[in-house]
Amino acid sequence: MKHLIRRLSRVADSSSEFSIRRSTSSFRNRRGHHRLHAPPPPWSICPARRVNTVPAGHVPVYVGEEMERFVVSAELMNHPIFVGLLNRSAQEYGYAQKGVLHIPCHVIVFERVVETLRLGGFEGSGDLENLVASLLSGDELIPETTE
Amino acid sequence: MVKPCWRIGAGMERSKINPTKVDGLTWYKDLGLHTFGEFSMAMIQANSVMEDQCQIESGPLTFNNPTVQGTFVGVYDGHGGPEASRFIADNIFPKLKKFASEGREISEQVISKAFAETDKDFLKTVTKQWPTNPQMASVGSCCLAGVICNGLVYIANTGDSRAVLGRSERGGVRAVQLSVEHNANLESARQELWSLHPNDPTILVMKHRLWRVKGVIQVTRSIGDAYLKRAEFNREPLLPKFRLPEHFTKPILSADPSVTITRLSPQDEFIILASDGLWEHLSNQEAVDIVHNSPRQGIARRLLKAALKEAAKKREMRYSDLTEIHPGVRRHFHDDITVIVVYLNPHPVKTNSWASPLSIRGGYPMHSTS
């Protein structure tokens, strides 16, 4: 676990080029109908603090110790990398957590992972590939209880 | 109106006679006819492999006494894998018929013996498979069985599924819970375990804000879960998360069902039998109100949808978006859910339907992503 946290921190340090603002605009573009040449991105993320209702096709999540609220597309939830994040959540809080799902991950890492997914995957992004490998492997990430 | 034209068959042949439907992750039989009235069944998968199983059997309940006619309903909520719930669905009803044939009648003892022998035989299978498939020792299932016969309803329960009777009362319907549950988050179940294991300070441990037996499992009785019944399985190569740090001599979980017997009255309209996946989102009264106020056709699917809408609401998302979430990932939003609604008529629907027994099995095979 310590190994994973170190890795998360390292990735977090190099992720400043990805911003919430960019994520927000991509979400708006997805809702538009007049984009040429660029199909709507399959996945999007936006901060939901100022959004009263969750947009159609999206699921809210709380991220990190600071419980920052985001909405992510329902489709993104099915991505193996996101499944890794959800399994971390179940391992930490169980399946029966009340209300919005809480993902135990640094906000800045979460943003970078989702943004990378949105832009077309993890090819050529060594740090993130390693991060994902960490997320998806190891017994420690399988929920320890049986239901 | 569905005509009572069913015959017992096997596999695909049977499903042609008793058409059931699959829609994505949902399996259902919107309306059918059992010995004492109509029924409706529905299931939805949340785990990557469907762990719930269910069945309804209607007709003779013994091999040797054709006057003992009735309806058997089973809801089996598996955990750790689908093997235990599938084993119950394959075995418990034939065992019930076998024991009922010995005394030529249905009784509490007959049902309890069917549970005990099903558990014993599953543990034999675990022993046999231990060298090649040791993880079978950590597979288990809740088992809820209802038998309607001779104006009585027997509800036998091991685990935390639930049976609720809808009884008409002053223009409405009142929920009467018929099952006794075994879940560590019920005070009665905790007291039972503490009194059975007074010298084990870690028999119950709070984890993720929920009580769990040995910090692992919420149910306090089950079929299977060999690793908590026999110390011989508490070792490698069982996964470390299932291995207990200390040796034990007395079984930690038991397979004994709690049995209730209720004499049916004309006010008793229907019984809902469902896995805990339904009851974590709907109260007993909410469920009976839905059944009382809705058409019979598709009532089980209606209950399922009501539970899923509630699950989506709790996660602050839309029901329509929940349906986009794949099995496995779904488990973070709701559990596998099985619901069977059995409507009650005081007398057998048609005398000649006795010659046409009914057998429907739900939950296998379902979608698998693993």
UniProtKB/Swiss-Prot annotation, chain A:
It is found in: Cytoplasm. InterPro entries: SAUR_fam. Coiled coil: none annotated. Specifically expressed in the quiescent center and cortex or endodermis initials of root stem niches. Expressed in vascular tissues from hypocotyls, petioles and cotyledons. One of its GO terms (cellular component) is cytoplasm. Keywords: Auxin signaling pathway, Cytoplasm, Developmental protein, Growth regulation. Its main location: cytoplasm. Induction: By auxin. GO terms for biological process: auxin transport; auxin-activated signaling pathway; positive gravitropism; root radial pattern formation. Signal peptide: none annotated. Plants over-expressing SAUR41 display pleiotropic auxin-related phenotypes. These phenotypes include elongated hypocotyls, increased length of primary roots, increased numbers of lateral roots, increased vegetative biomass, twisted inflorescence stems, overexpanded petals, reduced seed setting and increased basipetal auxin transport in hypocotyls. PANTHER family: AUXIN-INDUCED PROTEIN-LIKE-RELATED (PTHR31374), AUXIN-RESPONSIVE PROTEIN SAUR41 (PTHR31374:SF254). Belongs to the ARG7 family. Plays a role in the regulation of cell expansion, root meristem patterning and auxin transport. This is Auxin-responsive protein SAUR41. The lineage of its organism: Eukaryota, Viridiplantae, Streptophyta, Embryophyta, Tracheophyta. The gene is SAUR41.
Swiss-Prot record, chain B:
InterPro entries: PP2C, PP2C_BS, PPM-type-like_dom_sf, PPM-type_phosphatase-like_dom. Its main location: membrane. Residues 35-344 form the PPM-type phosphatase domain. It catalyses: O-phospho-L-seryl-[protein] + H2O = L-seryl-[protein] + phosphate; O-phospho-L-threonyl-[protein] + H2O = L-threonyl-[protein] + phosphate. The gene is PP2C67. The keyword Manganese applies. Belongs to the PP2C family. Interacts with SAUR19. Interacts with AHA2 at the plasma membrane. Keywords: Cell membrane, Hydrolase, Magnesium, Manganese, Membrane, Metal-binding, Protein phosphatase. Gene3D superfamilies: PPM-type phosphatase domain. This is Probable protein phosphatase 2C 67. Its cofactor is Mg(2+); Mn(2+). It is found in: Cell membrane. Binds 2 magnesium or manganese ions per subunit. Its EC number is 3.1.3.16. Disruption phenotype: Reduced apical hook maintenance in etiolated seedlings. The pp2c-d1 pp2c-d2 double mutant displays a long hypocotyl phenotype and strongly reduced apical hook maintenance in etiolated seedlings. GO terms for molecular function: metal ion binding; phosphatase activity; protein serine/threonine phosphatase activity. It is a peripheral membrane protein. Dephosphorylates and represses plasma membrane H(+)-ATPases (PM H(+)-ATPases, e.g. AHA1 and AHA2), thus influencing negatively plant growth and fitness. Promotes the apical hook maintenance of etiolated seedlings. Mn(2+) 2 binds at D77, D276, D335.
